[in-house]
């Protein structure tokens, strides 16, 4: 099996580090991974590791092969952990994590971060994503209409939380106010968090705040509301299996380097 780890020509440190860890992990399994800054039309790898969907779109038309997408993870610390999934971003990827055991959750994440359900917050939180981001690339986003619909559907104030990295990409969304604090503070005080498919849904579910999401790329798609019909009385499903499954989407660099991640992901080829 031939596996290539693609990094951009500028060789960003996080991409190179992920590629080196992945190649080290493959070596533990008797496989060789090659790091490359170029993927041509005659490329013959069976699998290409790429960081981010921009690189995936660069590579896939040329290689016509599967890709394994490395990205920021879902449970914190998102900059320490790396998510690894086949052929898609977030919930569009394949992680082979359905009905996972709870060992990874208990080992790494069962530290009190999963709070009891508490749908009694003082406002509805609308979290914005970056305009043009890959996660909403094919979704018809109209945040102003969504804010208007929310205000009609609830007596609670609707607060808008802009994306912390790039603010203002959607202009000024008219609602009942804005939330300028951290996402952790924002979801803790909300009755419901409303998002297209952002990771604020994960933060919210962990905080015990129900979520409305509108796109199946969301990592809380299976346990969140899909529309506004239950906004005033949200369901409170068991989150145990969701937490166990999500723990099998992300890996520490050292787990990748010793082959633990590939031990799980290689089942695609068995």
What are these regions (language model features)?
Residues 81-122, 137, 221-270:
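Leloir-type glycosyltransferase catalytic cores
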Residues 1-47, 132-133, 267-270:
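N-terminal pre-catalytic "stem/leader" segment of glycosyltransferase-like enzymes
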Residues 16-22, 140-153:
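Well-ordered, non-membrane alpha-helical segments in soluble/globular domains
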Residues 37-62, 66-71, 192-196:
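Short, well-ordered secondary-structure micro-motifs within conserved domains or adaptor modules
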Residues 54-85, 144-145, 206-220:
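A short, gly/pro- and small-residue-rich
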């Amino acid at each position: 099996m031939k596996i290539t780890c693609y990094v951009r020509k500028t060789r960003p440190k996080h991409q190179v580090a992920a590629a080196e860890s992945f190649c080290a992990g493959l070596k533990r399994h008797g496989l060789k991974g090659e790091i490359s800054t170029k993927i041509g039309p005659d490329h013959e790898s069976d699998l290409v590791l790429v960081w981010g969907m921009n690189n995936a779109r660069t590579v896939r038309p040329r290689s016509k092969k599967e890709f394994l997408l490395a990205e920021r993870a879902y449970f914190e610390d998102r900059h320490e952990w790396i998510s690894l999934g086949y052929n898609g971003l977030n919930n569009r990827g394949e992680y082979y994590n359905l009905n996972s055991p709870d060992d990874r959750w208990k080992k790494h994440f069962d530290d009190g971060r999963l709070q009891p359900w508490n749908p009694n917050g003082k406002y509805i939180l609308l979290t914005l994503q970056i305009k043009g981001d890959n996660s909403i690339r094919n979704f018809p986003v109209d945040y102003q209409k969504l804010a208007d619909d929310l205000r009609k559907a609830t007596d609670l104030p609707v607060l808008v939380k802009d994306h912390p990295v790039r603010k203002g990409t959607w202009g000024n969304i008219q609602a009942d106010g804005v939330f300028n604090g951290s996402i952790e503070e924002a979801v803790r005080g909300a009755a419901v968090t409303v998002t297209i498919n952002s990771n604020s849904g994960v933060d919210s579910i962990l905080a015990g705040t129900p979520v409305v999401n509108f796109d199946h790329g969301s990592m809380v798609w299976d346990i969140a509301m899909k529309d506004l019909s239950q906004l005033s009385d949200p369901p409170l499903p068991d989150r145990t299996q969701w937490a166990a499954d999500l723990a099998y989407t992300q890996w520490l660099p050292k787990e990748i380097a010793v082959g633990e991640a590939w031990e799980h992901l290689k089942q695609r080829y068995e």
